[in-house]
Amino acid sequence: MSEPKYKRILLKLSGEALAQGEQGFGVDPTRVHEIAAEIAEVHRLGVDIGVVVGGGNFFRGVAEQAKDMDRVSADHMGMLATVMNSLAVQDALEKQNVQCRVMSAIEIFQVAEPFIRRRAMRHLEKGRVVIFAAGTGNPYFSTDTAASLRAAEIKADVIMKATKVDGIYDADPHKVADATMFAQITYMDVLKKGLRVMDATAISLCQENRLPIVVFNLNERGNIQRVVMGEAVGSLVSA
């Protein structure tokens, strides 16, 4: 079997990926176990894996539901949502016999380790999957930005952003039938065109640190491994 193209990855999952259906709420155990099985397959290839999970299946600080709330309080609720999701993914991975640690950007000692970069690096070197919870630990920063930050900190080779579409399009493919998908695009073009890949802060952080981003469809079974092996899956964002 050929060698993986990427030796260390940061996988970004949306909270909605763990839920059932389009507008799913909460965690669907079957879906979480399907995702964990795919991560476990990649882990068995000897790839170092960091994971960042969003919290949108429980609460989103910038969403309509939070419009009358203080933004900082809303973002803190979103961070706690990511902790719940991280624990769900950890449990599913452990059932796949994958050693796993949740590291939280906010102190929550009873359920997760605090994020300490050197300790995270040690876990990865020991072959453990590390799930980074609670975003950056600061309000006003998205979990996409947290993914970019953690990827830079652990010296990941790539950020793999799992979505419900095949890649990056010039328009919403669910609304525009003839939307065109980009096989490859630069950071600057993503920013100039206002493409909703990640927020501008996350994209800029990747650009500064020369971190490629692969946007791919998580609903296509086996895509995580295909991306890791370097197959032409999804859209690549690079310099």
UniProtKB/Swiss-Prot annotation:
Allosterically activated by GTP. Inhibited by UTP. It is found in: Cytoplasm. It catalyses: UMP + ATP = UDP + ADP. Its main location: cytoplasm. Gene3D superfamilies: Acetylglutamate kinase-like. One of its GO terms (cellular component) is cytoplasm. The keyword Glycosyltransferase does not apply. GO terms for molecular function: ATP binding; UMP kinase activity. Keywords: Allosteric enzyme, ATP-binding, Cytoplasm, Kinase, Nucleotide-binding, Pyrimidine biosynthesis, Transferase. Its EC number is 2.7.4.22. The keyword Transferase applies. SUPFAM superfamilies: Carbamate kinase-like. One of its GO terms (biological process) is UDP biosynthetic process. Residues 21-26 are annotated as: Involved in allosteric activation by GTP. It is an enzyme of class 2 (transferase). UMP binds at G55, D75, T136, G137, N138, P139, Y140, F141, S142, T143. It comes from the Bacteria. InterPro entries: AceGlu_kinase-like_sf, Asp/Glu/Uridylate_kinase, Uridylate_kinase, Uridylate_kinase_bac. Pathway: Pyrimidine metabolism; CTP biosynthesis via de novo pathway; UDP from UMP (UMPK route): step 1/1. ATP binds at K12, L13, S14, G15, G56, R60, T163, Y169, D172. Catalyzes the reversible phosphorylation of UMP to UDP. Belongs to the UMP kinase family. This is Uridylate kinase. The gene is pyrH.
